[in-house]
């Protein structure tokens, strides 16, 4: 039944709505003075029974209630990336998510569970080894440059010549490191 204004003051039961979402947040009695309408964000139409995991949302255009899934405050996981998604809005869950969290790094979703993604881990370890190798090559080159300058100018001390030889040997051994065997690499010792 739709609300009708009256010439008489009255107290009626109203159902309060959350501004913005129009979801049911409680009921109470409201005093309605003559020739006035309902308080803002309320209706006099009772909501349906609300099962767990849902909220009742009032559609003021249709003057009716709808049950909408409510997963707010919960965390789900994107099956493509494994990233956690915090649900903050009403409605059904996004597609391609699961309630199951991945256990550790390098996990992929197989349709029913998270499984170890050995290929992704291997590629990560190779990239990590390449980065380490590049950084160590840069360190070696930075040590070699001034020692090589001293040798080229024939002003290097015996200690500098020995260090130059050690750093060059280190750089050659480092260059021979095969990063495709990332987990089995034996890095040469720094001079």
From Swiss-Prot:
The record's InterPro entries line, in alphabetical order, gives: Phage_T4_Gp38_tail_assem (IPR003458), TFA_Chaperone (IPR051220)
The region annotated as signal peptide is none
- Give the top-rank taxon of the lineage listed in the UniProt record for this protein: Bacteria
The family assignment reads: Belongs to the tfa family.
What name does UniProt use for this protein?
Prophage tail fiber assembly protein homolog TfaR
Q: What is the lineage of its organism?
A: Bacteria, Pseudomonadati, Pseudomonadota, Gammaproteobacteria, Enterobacterales
- Whichever gene encodes this chain, its name is tfaR
């Amino acid at each position: 039944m739709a609300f009708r204004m009256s010439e008489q003051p009255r107290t009626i039961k109203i159902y309060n709505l959350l501004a913005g979402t129009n979801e049911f947040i409680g009921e109470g009695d409201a005093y309605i003075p003559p020739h006035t309408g309902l308080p803002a964000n309320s209706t006099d139409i009772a909501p349906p029974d609300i099962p767990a995991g849902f909220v009742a949302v009032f559609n003021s255009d249709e003057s009716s209630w709808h049950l909408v899934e409510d997963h707010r405050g919960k965390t789900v996981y994107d099956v493509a990336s494994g990233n956690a998604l915090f649900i903050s809005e009403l409605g059904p869950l996004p597609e391609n998510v699961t309630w199951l969290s991945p256990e550790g790094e390098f996990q992929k979703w197989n349709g029913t569970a998270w499984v170890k993604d050995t290929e992704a881990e291997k590629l990560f370890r190779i990239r990590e080894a390449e980065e380490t190798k590049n950084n160590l090559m840069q360190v070696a080159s930075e040590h070699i440059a001034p020692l090589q300058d001293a040798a080229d100018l024939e002003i290097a001390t015996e200690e500098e010549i020995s260090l130059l030889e050690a750093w060059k040997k280190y750089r050659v051994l480092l260059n021979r490191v095969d990063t495709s065997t990332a987990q089995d690499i034996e890095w040469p010792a720094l001079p």
